[in-house]
């Protein structure tokens, strides 16, 4: 009896264990099935999101573009190449294909290439901004990880590449002027010398047609290589290139500036300049004569003469004239040490800035004596002359007028001295003569305008 009961007990326990195992297996199968079903759902949902993103891009970008769909390693690439008529714009294709070849990583990504059209700032030219957009496809998530501009492609209205050399009537002269202007721009940024020299060399070694550029806000924008801190771009005013630019590309605002530039260039102009003041006895008389004829001039003053004549210096500026630097005590700067010469100039800059609140950044070296080392050590423009009245020598009214009559030409800078009474007395006759010859009177900044650069020497409007 006991053995029979024991056998039945053992058999029951075995059955319970078996049933439990079957239950666990059934639950596991259900869970696994649910997990697989969820993964299938998750994968389908993920694929639907990918297809939805592709459709969204297709709706946005298919018009006017040729779509190409391919794989680069593990990356799925969809490129929208813009069409000109029925042909792909080749310069855009080349830029995209180069990026695919050189920079696209072989990862499980979805990559879009496309362009956006924008105004170029030039007549008959459009920009295509080429963009790369990358989405990571990881763990059933679509995440945008990069949106990069590959650069701008400039195109003519018929879809042909527009390069910087095409903007100019004389590409060789334009490149020479561009190098000069960008060198001055870089110097003002205080870039390390070896870096600045490398940037200039890279531009010089490249054909103008290969320069990376943009045009906006009446400026030619250049992109240097190598890129250095505080110098992502070089912005040069288009007015500095009016002599060599193809004006047909200029829009209304810039075309008006261009026309104004040539109107003024063909207008007869002369700049009267006065050195060695201020002199409280004679300078006010010069100012009164200039005011009578409504003429603005440029005064190069000595630093030592400013003390005690601060109000007179302020009057010169307040009446619309320009005040420049003529050294502290009128030495021959080229015969001084570099430090001594710089001190003569910087001390005068300091006193003028203190009295006037700012500096004109114009300097005239006494006797016209200056060295390259002095010029290159100071962020000033150096103003010489091409007409010497010799008033300092003759001190004779008739002789002063005669000298000017013999030398003056369109764009001349006339040297006189506001410290001599004969000059004061000759000034009305000089003005009357020049007016009768059709001259308009301008200050140095008005005459030289965008030509004015630090460290440079100027003898006239065109020299």
UniProtKB/Swiss-Prot annotation:
Annotated transmembrane regions: 18-38
Topology of this chain in the membrane: Single-pass membrane protein
Location, primary (coarse class): membrane
Regulation (activators, inhibitors): Enzymatic activity is inhibited by EDTA in vitro.
Cofactor(s) required for function per UniProt: Zn(2+); Co(2+)
Catalytic reaction annotation: peptidoglycan-N-acetyl-D-glucosamine + H2O = peptidoglycan-D-glucosamine + acetate
Enzyme Commission (EC) number: 3.5.1.104
Recorded phenotype for the gene knockout or disruption: Cells lacking this gene produce fully N-acetylated glycan, become hypersensitive to exogenous lysozyme in the stationary phase of growth, and show reduced virulence in the intraperitoneal mouse model.
Domain NodB homology: 268-442
Site positions (Raises pKa of active site His): 391
GO biological process: carbohydrate metabolic process; cell wall modification
Cofactor note: Zn(2+). Although displays higher activity with Co(2+) than with Zn(2+) in vitro, bioavailability may well limit this enzyme to be zinc-dependent.
Localization in the cell: Cell membrane
Record: residues binding Zn(2+): 276, 326, 330
Keyword field contains Cell membrane: yes
InterPro entries to which the protein is assigned, alphabetical: GlcNAc_deacetylase, Glyco_hydro/deAcase_b/a-brl, NODB_dom, Peptidoglycan_deacetylase, PgdA_N, Polysacc_deacetylase_ArnD
Effect recorded for residue 417 to S: Loss of activity
UniProt GO molecular function: lysozyme inhibitor activity; N-acetylglucosamine deacetylase activity; zinc ion binding
Residues that hold substrate according to the record: 367
Residues at the active site: 275 (proton acceptor), 417 (proton donor)
Protein keywords: Carbohydrate metabolism, Cell membrane, Cobalt, Hydrolase, Membrane, Metal-binding, Transmembrane, Transmembrane helix, Virulence, Zinc
Gene Ontology cellular component terms for the protein in this record: plasma membrane
Function as written in the Swiss-Prot or TrEMBL entry: Catalyzes the deacetylation of N-acetylglucosamine (GlcNAc) residues in peptidoglycan, a modification that confers host lysozyme resistance and contributes to pneumococcal virulence.
Alphabetical list of PANTHER family matching this protein: CHITIN DEACETYLASE 1-RELATED, GLYCOSYL TRANSFERASE-RELATED
Protein's recorded name: Peptidoglycan-N-acetylglucosamine deacetylase
């Amino acid at each position: 009896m006991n053995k029979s009961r024991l056998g039945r007990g053992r058999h029951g326990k075995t059955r319970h264990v078996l049933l439990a195992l079957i239950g666990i297996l059934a639950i596991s199968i259900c869970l696994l099935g649910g997990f697989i079903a969820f993964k299938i759902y998750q994968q389908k949902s993920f694929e639907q999101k990918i297809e939805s993103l592709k459709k969204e891009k297709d709706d946005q970008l298919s018009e006017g573009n040729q779509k190409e769909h391919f794989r680069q390693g593990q990356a799925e690439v969809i490129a929208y190449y813009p069409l000109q008529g029925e042909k792909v714009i080749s310069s855009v294709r080349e830029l995209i294909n180069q990026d695919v070849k050189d920079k696209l990583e072989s990862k499980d990504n979805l990559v879009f290439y496309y362009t956006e059209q924008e105004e170029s700032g030039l007549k008959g030219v459009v920009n295509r901004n080429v963009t790369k957009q990358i989405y990571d496809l990881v763990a059933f998530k679509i995440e945008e990880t990069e949106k990069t501009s590959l650069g701008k492609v400039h195109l003519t209205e018929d879809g042909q590449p527009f390069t910087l050399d095409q903007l100019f009537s004389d590409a060789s002269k334009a490149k020479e002027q561009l190098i000069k202007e960008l060198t001055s721009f870089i110097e003002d940024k205080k870039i390390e010398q070896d870096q600045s020299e490398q940037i200039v060399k890279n531009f010089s070694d490249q054909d103008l047609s290969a320069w990376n550029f943009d045009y906006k806000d009446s400026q030619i924008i250049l992109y240097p290589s190598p890129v250095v801190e505080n110098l992502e771009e070089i912005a040069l005013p288009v007015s500095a290139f009016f002599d060599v630019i193809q004006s047909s590309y200029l829009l209304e605002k810039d075309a008006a500036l261009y026309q104004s530039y040539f109107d003024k260039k063909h207008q007869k102009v002369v700049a009267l300049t006065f050195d060695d003041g201020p002199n409280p006895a004679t300078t006010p008389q010069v100012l009164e004569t200039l005011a009578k004829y409504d003429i603005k001039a440029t005064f190069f003053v000595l630093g030592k003469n400013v003390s005690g004549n601060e109000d007179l210096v302020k009057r010169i500026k307040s009446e619309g004239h320009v005040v420049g630097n003529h050294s502290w005590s009128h030495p021959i700067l080229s015969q001084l040490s570099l430090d001594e010469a710089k001190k003569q100039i910087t001390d005068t800059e300091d006193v003028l800035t203190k009295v006037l609140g700012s500096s004109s950044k114009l300097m005239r070296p006494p006797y016209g004596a200056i060295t390259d080392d002095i010029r290159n050590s100071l962020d000033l423009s150096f103003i010489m002359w091409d007409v010497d009245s010799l008033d300092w020598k003759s001190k004779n009214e008739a002789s002063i007028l005669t000298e000017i009559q013999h030398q003056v030409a369109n764009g001349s800078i006339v040297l006189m001295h506001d410290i001599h009474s004969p000059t004061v007395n000759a000034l009305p006759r000089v003005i009357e003569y020049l007016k009768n010859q059709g001259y308009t009177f301008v200050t140095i900044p008005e005459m030289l305008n965008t030509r004015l650069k630090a460290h440079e020497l100027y003898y006239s409007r065109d020299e």
